[in-house]
């Protein structure tokens, strides 16, 4: 491919040089001489406006894409409200279908113990989904305090021109530095940081559980509803053919009532929506679970990957200072100090604060000695 380009560019460069040489001659046509002069004048103006001895190709690319970055940041900022409303509407529609369509059907077929189990599990799951989503939206992710000189500073933010503690990154959408920033989530219209990271992951986890529960539990109802919809289509087709043939003396085929049609279509909608969300959100939840097990955020994964490659080229081994071990990483992330906290802080709604203040990252006192030794690099 490079050889083909060289074959094409060679004659083009030769023709350009000939035109430039002809432009300096007096016998050259005035039109050609004027075009050459304008070309050179344009090059001088362009270089005088854009030349920077400290810049390079990366700087030029960043400057060229800056309008696109600005457009994306502002679009995501305004679309966040739309995404939040969409999540609320879709979740409310599933809950409404479960009460109005699914519940009357299972009351006729399920036994009392089975009904009790579904009643308690579904409402427990729904409460956790609503609680964690509300907390993830309304809880600020955490920002570095302004005007403090006693905090541990790692670097200076190039956007805010303020001290930036460890694991702090600048969000171009919120236009602020965020403590332990993971990413900006448009579905929350909020940054995921130190103080709401647990709420975000818990919402993803329990929403995935709820979608799997609805999809698996409504499989039989979905099959019956889908078959009924196909039958409705066939009956409507036969009815249209009968009207076209003007067979008024024949008895019209039986049709489904409006309530039955709405119920069947709602069950199909429920199954497809829950199944698709379970697959997409389940993959995202697994991805974040892997990152939490490694003691890193989405941004730190890219940083650690580059640092790992840099040290590997020098024959050295990279160690993550914030990796205390898989189990201890989860304890720190979920705020679990005792065995009782797995129930009161994980399986039940809890608004407890995470460990630390998001600026200094000393290991908790209950972290094992092995984890502490891993930190010391």
Curated annotation (Swiss-Prot):
Keyword tags: Acyltransferase, Apoptosis, DNA damage, Endoplasmic reticulum, Membrane, Transferase, Transmembrane, Transmembrane helix
Any one Gene Ontology molecular-function term assigned to this protein's record: protein-cysteine S-palmitoyltransferase activity
Ranges facing Lumenal side: 101-116, 220-266
EC number: 2.3.1.225
Keyword Glycoprotein: no
Cytoplasmic compartment segments: 1-79, 138-198, 288-377
Membrane topology listed for this record: Multi-pass membrane protein
Active site residues of this protein: 185 (s-palmitoyl cysteine intermediate)
Presence of keyword DNA damage: yes
Reactions it catalyzes: L-cysteinyl-[protein] + hexadecanoyl-CoA = S-hexadecanoyl-L-cysteinyl-[protein] + CoA
GO cellular component: endoplasmic reticulum membrane; Golgi apparatus
Record's subunit section: Interacts with ABL1. Interacts with COPS5/JAB1.
Role this protein plays: Palmitoyl acyltransferase that mediates palmitoylation of proteins such as PLN and ZDHHC6. Required during embryonic heart development and cardiac function, possibly by mediating palmitoylation of PLN, thereby affecting PLN phosphorylation and homooligomerization. Also required for eye development. Palmitoylates ZDHHC6, affecting the quaternary assembly of ZDHHC6, its localization, stability and function. May play a role in DNA damage response. May be involved in apoptosis regulation. Involved in the proliferation of neural stem cells by regulating the FGF/ERK pathway.
Designated name of the protein: Palmitoyltransferase ZDHHC16
